[in-house]
From Swiss-Prot:
Keywords: Early protein. It holds the Pfam family Papilloma_E5. Belongs to the papillomaviridae E5 protein family. InterPro entries: Papilloma_E5_alpha. This is Probable protein E5.
């Protein structure tokens, strides 16, 4: 049982790091002034998360918050601290 919990925790952490890298690549490749491209990329990520999770809209919403908005917030705070 302990091994399964550790495996699930490692998988969630690796998935979070992967999503953080995806958000970083999106922020580097897409100009932030062209918000329609960022919006389209966000919609594409919502669809991908929906197909991966595919249980309910509420679960997809929480997964999207955890694995997209939280990494974006961390990147935003990191760049804000660098500019100070």
């Amino acid at each position: 049982l302990y091994r399964h919990i550790v495996t699930i925790a490692v998988f969630i952490i690796l998935l979070f790091v992967l999503c953080l890298c995806v958000c970083l690549v999106l922020c580097c490749l897409l100009p932030l002034l062209l918000s329609q491209y960022v919006f389209a990329a966000a919609l594409l990520l919502i669809l991908c998360f929906w197909f991966v999770v595919a249980t309910s809209q509420l679960t997809t919403f929480f997964v999207y918050l955890i694995f997209f908005y939280l990494p974006c917030l961390l990147l935003h705070l990191y760049t804000f601290l660098l500019l100070q």
